[in-house]
């Protein structure tokens, strides 16, 4: 394959697609790829940008993918670099770093649904990065599409002029050519100095079984070639370049160099993505750039949960599996922990609940593990009486009550857009979740935008499911962490047969403790199988028992073998059984079924 002449910077366009879940982003990406003939019709599959099975099944994008497209317009050859971004709230860090490598973004809105909360959040990230925003109304072929109302909706909500918005249908392939031409004429070419020292931004990284850890980079200044030695500015380590490629969902395209303004994949032969952290800067080892690229924050976990293998001898397999997933996911972090009830496992940090579900599902599906997940928690700031501060993410680490001066919990600012008919139900839900209303505005007659501050631990349990059920699935939701605020929190323990089951402990608002404790013991009573001895299930705060249920013992007919009517013989056997039950009650261990741990997540 002969080496192509480098594309001049004025003919490069780097753009990304911002859209809410289900607004047709991946389908639109497929259309653009097909229109530019980047993939032959034979190899084209739907959602070609979503490479994980779990992405295709759930219809969501998790890892941001990129593709290089060639397009000829008015006799000139252009290179269009499309960076696909996830749309779900948990993956907004993927969005922010993808947007840093672009000059423009397509704001895709479903013609039947209008602007959603997540879209607004990501559009603001794009505007903060000074991106040119092109509004695109998708699904115009649907009978209930209302293009004029949606344009007005975008103008009112985000403040972007939509008089010339592109109207497309990715499914029916309408308006795709016009959209490509609009990208070329409207989105600015990349800026940067081709003669300056190399400065490249890593905006994604993943692990390849053959090439090791790969970095997806945007060249901001200078250029990179295969003979170069590279310095990773964050780690201070130097590496030789083993290979350079242009991104394509099916097969990477090798190249000798990546020029200023281009997007490409760099292989440095590294064993883990931790050596090429996302947001880090690559530069030339001999002639480094004076300052790395600014404005990047490492992804911080928001939710923590314990993951334990059901087969206790598979602890090492779980460690291996987590390490492999971490190669691809710099937001995932974990440390070993042990629980009296569940044995050895890991405390794992996630970006949010969807991230936690996806990781758990991948561990079970790709590595064949059976796992128990404990109730998710957030990080609490505990001020102790000796003026020190302790950060607690596991309820079992909470110090005794008499050592605590106060506890602060993290709050988030939640933005919710809902049809106005569900407003009453929604406000009731938010009040139950200890929400504080900050703002309420009507976007039009039928849609309302609410802004609330909420404690993080109220949204990590089941808030998303409840939000969807009380608005029949129509509300959309986005949040950003704001600050820690003082709260009245206590640790609620569950005791089974007198022993605290550490994996079931939760930190909860004091006013909700009795209600939750009552619900917990009642649910546990249903789930724990009857034993040969009586089992007490108690909920306690500190040393105070606040709720109790008893599982009656299974009666075994010990007198069945006694024929004839000797009552003393029967009495002797019954006394012996009573003694045995007493002893079992003292030393007996109760096996807790996995459903008991899952039940905690589902209890209001």
Swiss-Prot record:
Keyword flag Protein transport: no
This protein's GO CC annotations: plasma membrane
Similarity annotation: Belongs to the TRAFAC class translation factor GTPase superfamily. Classic translation factor GTPase family. LepA subfamily.
GO molecular function: GTP binding; GTPase activity; ribosome binding; translation elongation factor activity
HAMAP family xrefs: LepA
Domain of life: Bacteria
Residues annotated to bind GTP: 22-27, 138-141
Reaction(s) catalysed by this chain's protein: GTP + H2O = GDP + phosphate + H(+)
Record-linked PROSITE patterns: G_TR_1, G_TR_2
Alphabetized NCBIfam families for the sequence: lepA (TIGR01393), small_GTP (TIGR00231)
Entry-linked InterPro entries: EF-4, EFG_III/V, EFG_V-like, EFTu-like_2, G_TR_CS, LepA_C_sf, LepA_CTD, LepA_IV
Domain tr-type G: 10-191
Name listed for the protein in its UniProt record: Elongation factor 4
One annotated GO biological process: positive regulation of translation
Source organism per UniProt: Helicobacter pylori (strain P12)
Function: Required for accurate and efficient protein synthesis under certain stress conditions. May act as a fidelity factor of the translation reaction, by catalyzing a one-codon backward translocation of tRNAs on improperly translocated ribosomes. Back-translocation proceeds from a post-translocation (POST) complex to a pre-translocation (PRE) complex, thus giving elongation factor G a second chance to translocate the tRNAs correctly. Binds to ribosomes in a GTP-dependent manner.
Subcellular location: Cell inner membrane
Keywords, comma-separated and alphabetical: Cell inner membrane, Cell membrane, GTP-binding, Hydrolase, Membrane, Nucleotide-binding, Protein biosynthesis
Alphabetical list of Gene3D superfamilies matching this protein: 3.30.70.240, Elongation factor 4, C-terminal domain, Elongation Factor G (Translational Gtpase), domain 3, P-loop containing nucleotide triphosphate hydrolases, Translation factors
EC number(s) reported in the record: 3.6.5.n1
Membrane topology (UniProt): Peripheral membrane protein
């Amino acid at each position: 394959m002969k080496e192509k002449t480098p594309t001049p910077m004025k003919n490069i366009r780097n753009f990304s697609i911002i859209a809410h879940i289900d607004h047709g982003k991946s389908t639109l990406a497929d259309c653009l790829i097909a229109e530019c003939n980047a993939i032959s019709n034979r190899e084209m599959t739907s959602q070609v940008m979503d490479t994980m099975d779990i992405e295709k099944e759930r219809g969501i994008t998790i890892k941001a993918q990129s593709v290089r497209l060639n397009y000829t317009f008015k006799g000139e050859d252009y290179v269009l670099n499309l960076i696909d971004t996830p749309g779900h709230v948990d993956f907004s860090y993927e969005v922010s770093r993808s947007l840093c490598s672009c000059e423009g973004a397509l704001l895709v809105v479903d013609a039947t649904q209008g602007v959603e909360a997540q879209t607004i959040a990501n559009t603001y990230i794009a505007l903060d990065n000074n991106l040119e925003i092109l509004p695109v109304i998708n699904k115009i072929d649907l009978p209930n599409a209302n293009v004029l109302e949606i344009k007005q909706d975008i103008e009112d909500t985000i403040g972007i002029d939509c008089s010339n918005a592109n109207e497309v249908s990715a499914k029916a392939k309408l308006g795709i050519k016009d959209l490509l031409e609009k990208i070329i004429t409207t989105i600015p070419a990349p800026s940067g100095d081709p003669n300056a020292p190399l400065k490249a931004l890593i905006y994604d990284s993943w692990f390849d079984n053959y090439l090791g850890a790969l970095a997806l980079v945007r060249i901001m200044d200078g250029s990179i070639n295969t003979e170069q030695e590279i310095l990773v500015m964050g780690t201070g380590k130097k590496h030789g370049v083993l290979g350079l490629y242009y991104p394509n969902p099916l097969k990477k395209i090798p190249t000798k160099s990546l020029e200023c303004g281009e997007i490409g994949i760099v292989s440095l032969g590294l064993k883990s993505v931790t050596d090429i952290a996302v947001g880090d800067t690559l530069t030339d080892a001999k002639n480094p750039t004076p300052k790395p690229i600014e404005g990047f924050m490492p992804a911080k976990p928001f939710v923590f949960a314990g993951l334990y293998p059901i087969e206790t001898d598979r602890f090492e397999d779980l460690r291996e599996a987590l390490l492999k997933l971490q190669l691809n996911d710099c937001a995932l972090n974990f440390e070993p922990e042990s629980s009296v009830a569940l044995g050895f496992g890991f405390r794992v940090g996630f970006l949010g609940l969807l991230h936690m579900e996806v990781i758990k599902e991948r561990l079970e599906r790709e590595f064949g593990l059976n796992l128990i997940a404990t109730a998710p928690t957030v990080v609490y700031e505990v001020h102790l009486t000796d003026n020190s501060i302790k950060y607690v993410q596991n309820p079992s680490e909470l110090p005794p009550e008499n050592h605590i001066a106060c506890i602060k919990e993290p709050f988030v600012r939640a933005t919710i857009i809902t049809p106005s008919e569900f407003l009453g139900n929604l406000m009731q839900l938010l009040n139950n979740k200890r929400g504080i209303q900050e703002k309420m505005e009507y976007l039009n007659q039928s849609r309302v935008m609410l802004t609330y501050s909420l404690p993080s631990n109220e949204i990590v349990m089941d808030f998303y499911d409840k939000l969807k059920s009380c608005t029949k699935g129509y509300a959309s939701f986005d949040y950003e962490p704001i600050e820690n605020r003082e709260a009245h929190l206590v640790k609620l323990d569950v005791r089974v047969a007198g022993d605290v089951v550490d994996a079931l402990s939760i930190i909860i608002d004091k006013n909700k403790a009795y209600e939750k404790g009552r619900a917990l013991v009642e649910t546990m009573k249903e789930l724990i199988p009857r034993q040969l001895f009586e089992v007490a299930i108690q909920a306690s705060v500190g040393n105070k028992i606040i709720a109790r249920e008893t599982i009656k013992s299974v009666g075994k007919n010990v007198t069945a073998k006694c024929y004839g009517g000797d009552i003393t013989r029967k009495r002797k056997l019954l006394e012996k059984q009573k003694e045995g039950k007493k002893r079992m009650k003292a030393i007996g261990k109760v096996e807790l079924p996995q459903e008991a741990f899952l039940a905690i997540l589902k209890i209001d």
